[in-house]
């Protein structure tokens, strides 16, 4: 019989392997070899399997896997068809959800009874439904009607039903930032303000951000006056009038006051916030002054020669110093009170300082019981309980027998329940006794209960009873409920071996269970759960099999804990380790206990005897005794088995090892031990990420990714409790077998779930108790809650059930029971309740209404379409309905396709081709005006706002979680929209037939999306291998958007990408995503459109990079993209993307069925104008893509009653379908092949689909706009915003055709110039702010008679005036903006020196507070020429000359890349500004991209041309000042540290003036590649980057740094791991990418180190992402304590100047006296004094001792003297020390020191010797020492991380007296010998304090500490003399203060 042919479908034919393809060569030899080898292999196979007498048949061919390539999303699974095995479909699992009422609100605005029902609905509807929040969707914000005051804030309860006013208990994690309180006091943060208000019960609120008086810190400035701008509240530093030049040229101001000169007048006016103007030169005359004395603080004002008293001159600053006046009004400061006096013309005397509103708090005198706190809620005193407890887990047993996580939780529960609960004892309670077999203690009842909820997981296990269980959780639930000892025998189904089941890893061999051997175990010890260390995990499993006990891998590495106290970290308590070990083993740490600090308080006498076998093989009488033994021995001990221990029955060893995981079908996991469950490491621990506490193992289901959870634990990774369970923490801390059931009483609880941390249930009003089962005295809990009648009815006749409950008689009693949650499939559709809330189905509505005791009925089937007041039903009535409300989706009886609504009153549905045509009509209606339609549409959608989320990060910013409702679906024809109050909540736009717009929130009103907002769209192309854990294979069916496969695949891809984008770096502007097309690629090519906020600054590379980062960190099976990722994830920057085809209204319900109306015109290639991508679109977009169609519903009105008569056929025309939208007029083209639309005002586009945004005029140098003549005879105020592409051009001009008068604004040499002439000569005012090409600038000017002011970008006004003579400005020409007509050029050039117009844009022009409508300039101008439209893209049009390439930068700035021979910002200059070189000497000249040249000054020179020689600063430190173009070139970091490639510790102190710039950079190459390390500022955030060869690690500071202040930053790298710390803030950790082949842990550097900038940023590594230099000052660059900013390390300095803004670098007034050295310490300093001087400023002289005095001691190398650190014995003799002798830095026995300070004088000839030592003797620990090594003095200290050695440059073995000063502050150290510059350094990141034994040694030590790697010199005693020893700024008496006093002798004289 011939073999049957194999049948395969073409698209399922498996691809040929590479081997077969290789052999398919048309070669006879190859064919012969192949046939021979195949025949030989077949013969061998036959012989090896042949047995005589046994016949076999060939195995039938396996049918093809029909589910391969079938993508099922949202929890559905693929199942083959029963009728047709060759077909398959996606079906939802028939899971039964728990009958639990825990309502949740989904992102589809529907309420579900619990989370399981939500997930079922997600699968059934095949759309993403997220958990929006706990509680029903219709619930209002509980804080909406609550007003909290006196410092408290509103906090909703966990169930969202109630709200409380609580005071903040801590401000940890709250945003910092000074705020001004309403009491006029500054607070560090708003949280601190609220805490203060709560604590003092004062009505204080935040008045302003920032300090109340921003000038508070500037009062000591003698050269400036600080004034707070009342508008911006920013301090303005104004020059004092006293510092004006002493010239006597009196002038008269317009306030009638004579001033010394013009400078004095302008400065006095500025200080008062006024613009004082000169009336005349000389003294004021009588006519210039007011005739009467001005009263009530009014000021004299002279206008047009008429002086009068005015209140306009009473101007006040913005400082907030509240004053309460007698009129009961609070004024911001006293000036405002004076202004009020002036305006009211009456006296308003002050009453007191501070605000008037000092209403006493209602909480004054109130007493709250049970630890509650009184807060003010809605104006009344209310006692509230504190709910939030911070801190670790420290369990206590309460007097109620309940275990609480801490004392705080106990007190909070006592307050909540209103009862007194005391701490009975430390540690957990044991109320239930011993709960066995995994049961948990229910403390309220004292019962042991079994958690029974198990998450479905396809991981069966074999139990020790020989039965197979669906999961390990099911096994433990069975063991608990049946109270039997049961454990997992093996994974998988049970397979018997003879009559037994092999357990603990044993395998069946020859009918006997044997244990496999470990022949080649992987290296690495592991710690078993029995406390034994095994050499490998394999040996652990072998031991478990041999001993037949359960042994799990507790952790990697040995079990022996680290010895406590072995090596100091430099900080922390010594007993921290012992405390942790004690706590881990069940003990309580008590320092006062007599039996030892670790107390094992176990009372086991009352526990019933129940023997257990311990893991140590010892039998204990109870489990309590085992725990006590575990605590006392402090060893790992657990119950190995129930009952007494028996001798282990050792299973025989298997002679050969079991098959390795490499021999399994899918190979090994990454641990090389666990067998993978599928391709791509599916089911492996590395991909599952199972929670180690909530799951049984690290493996998971290879298809769904579901881990094997413990009972009551849920989540994909088993990381949370299931609804209805709580206390996940108990699994971790108390070893619970799973989560604890909530056990809420259904009669008293409104929900079946509870709070996760406390287990409290949500009770009905009047019901109390943690489980809602308690009532007040005299009441009993019934079906209606707490009832006064305690009798319980017996029959249902006596019962009356409400809210849908039904009566049930059982156990002799009658009770009301709410309906079940289970509905038949026929009734599983959504329903709209009478409360306006959409519910999952009818049963869920009834159950939720019953449990919450609400009367809710079914309003309609399907989701709610408009707000319905509770209990009110819409009634029918005839009315005049707007047209668009009547346009409904009318479906044909024979058609299942819903149609797009028309824009007229009649709809003609499009029938299927096989269906008869059906005409459906609607009643006539009155058409609404466009304004009516717009207002109604606004009213419809205004409630589609966002709602509060659940707090989940994955929901943050989610489009569906935003609560956007559709709300715009029309009511049935003839119905009335009932509006009883505001709507509660609306359905999501995804419930509307036309779906959502591209913003993902707005429902589309029509298929064209006419109401949709604009979006910014990017197009991406992705090569996909799989999505949601399922492989993707391209089939032709995917190309059809109408196919089911396309729809399912599109929904899965869109949902996954939506998740990724919403957690990415671009999530703030991301709106939605839509799959455009699926095509063939390497696997499947997906083209997507990503829609963003139209104002976003993100570009296509940002979108692509954000998606790549999310793909790399997300779950591997979520979205599988072909590798390498960067080559298969691409987003396009430039492409033509027609707006009209960017989406259709295709919601999920409309899916593919909705026909999209498009034009039938053929757009020729010539008529299409390509434009820059990304495109802007206002089209609706849904979750799936609808097909393009050329059919459109007719829009002409037809008679309903008149039948249609066939007429002559004519060729269809393009305009028949009326394609022009929004009232546009359609005109057919003569060719008959297209049409054109004439759009109405405000519309544009091919079919008028675009909203024409207001245009900004653009000028090209010869363009201009002409407006009517300015009216500016005596006064003019003008504001203008412009963007220039060139540095020269006319902005504005108005002149006089016959006279000299004119007014002009122009750009000249890159600055704004304001000129005007009143007839007696021009005034020229030039701004000091440079104009940057491509950036928007704002200028403001004013003119009053001959005086004028000009300010650009908020600069201090530039003031000027025209020559005296005529004052008025006579203008008669047109006002020209942006340029001039040709006939005016010559005149204007002569007057302004500018003869060309502006090249750029002007977007705002305000004249005398009247804004000209430049956006509609076509209607406003008198004349125009050559004016275009200004684009948002700075390079459109191209501003660069000579064909230069334009590059767009941030904030609308561009950069022209000039070709050779062209220069300037737009490459318009042909002259090189550096030829000839204008710089002094050898300073190099650099051409700037913005135009001009820059001299790079070397060290010692400064100035624009390096012409200034800097004076020698002497001993002053050098602080480098950078201007954004300067830099320092130093030796590379690798030259300072030998092991820099492995690790690095660097510290930097800087002050930034600009938000961005490079701080330091060191690289390997100069081609933009290679390793590098960099630190840079990006928008005020620090970024520490380094690349070790595989990609850059980016570590970014969490908070932005403050500009203008000194900042200290610490950088650390060890291998691939790095850390960044700013100041004392938290450390931010990061890691560079990992490679599988090469470790990439070394940093290879070869180039110099650049600080503050670089000579050429294009040569830096691209991964550093820097393009600008640093603007600011750098004080310190320290590498492991070694200062790098010194002359010896600097190779080149370019334009670096000394920073003069620090006290240590001021030209005068050196703060350190008597030759002391000033050491910068960020913003402060420290003085290092020379010999003979001391004090903070070296102001104190040290009195020299006599030669023979014992205060000068001699040391002979064996003289070792001990002192108490930082204390003198003379002080110890005082019982009560004198206050003036106390010092807070010096304690009697300082053992943990944050700082050290030593000064001494020494004389010696020795080259070696230990001078001073602080530290423990005899062990390795922290120390600090002064020693002489090779004739130089060394300061060394070790705080626990790594020693630091500072070496002096001065030799001390000269037999001369030298003064030595050593200082340490935290990790910073300094050493100074004589007059040398101090040597400074720093220890690595880590400890900051020195832990010692409190002793200080002089002269040496008898024995050095063991283990310290110290030079030999430290072991040699000091030989020489010491005197004048100062310890901690205190003189040390060498004789009196000595603890050990060997034979001492004075130092001999020379």
From Swiss-Prot:
- Post-translational modification remark: Contains heparan and chondroitin sulfate chains and alpha-dystroglycan as well as N-linked and O-linked oligosaccharides. Heparin and heparin sulfate binding in the G3 domain is independent of calcium ions. Binds heparin with a stoichiometry of 2:1. Binds sialic acid with a stoichiometry of 1:1 and binding requires calcium ions. Glycosaminoglycans (GAGs), present in the N-terminal 110 kDa fragment, are required for induction of filopodia in hippocampal neurons. At synaptic junctions, cleaved at two conserved sites, alpha and beta, by neurotrypsin. Cleavage at the alpha-site produces the agrin N-terminal 110-kDa subunit and the agrin C-terminal 110-kDa subunit. Further cleavage of agrin C-terminal 110-kDa subunit at the beta site produces the C-terminal fragments, agrin C-terminal 90 kDa fragment and agrin C-terminal 22 kDa fragment. Excessive cleavage at the beta-site releases large amounts of the agrin C-terminal 22 kDa fragment leading to destabilization at the neuromuscular junction (NMJ). Cleavage is developmentally regulated.
UniProt feature, compositional bias: Low complexity: 892-906, 1183-1198
Q: Which domain of life is it from?
A: Eukaryota
The record's annotation in InterPro entries points to: ConA-like_dom_sf (IPR013320), EGF-like_Ca-bd_dom (IPR001881), EGF-like_dom (IPR000742), FacI_MAC (IPR003884), Fol_N (IPR003645), Kazal_dom (IPR002350), Kazal_dom_sf (IPR036058), Laminin_G (IPR001791)
User: Laminin G-like domain location, by residue?
Assistant: 1254-1430, 1517-1699, 1775-1947
Residues carrying the site annotation Highly important for the agrin receptor complex activity of the 'z' insert: 1774
Q: Which positions does the site annotation Alternative splice site to produce 'z' isoforms cover?
A: 1770
Tagged with keyword Methyltransferase:
no
* Segments forming a coiled coil: none
Question: Site annotated as Cleavage, beta site: where?
Answer: 1745-1746
Q: Which PANTHER family is this protein grouped with?
A: AGRIN (PTHR15036:SF83), PIKACHURIN-LIKE PROTEIN (PTHR15036)
**Function noted in UniProt:** Isoform 2 and isoform 3: these isoforms lacking the 'z' insert (z0) are muscle-specific, have no AChR clustering ability and may be involved in nervous system endothelial cell differentiation.
Query: What is noted besides the main data?
Result: Mice that have excessive neurotrypsin-mediated agrin cleavage, exhibit pathological symptoms characteristic of precocious sarcopenia, with fragmentation and disassembly of the neuromuscular junction (NMJ).
Protein name stated in the entry: Agrin
The taxonomy runs: Eukaryota, Metazoa, Chordata, Craniata, Vertebrata
Whichever gene encodes this chain, its name is Agrn
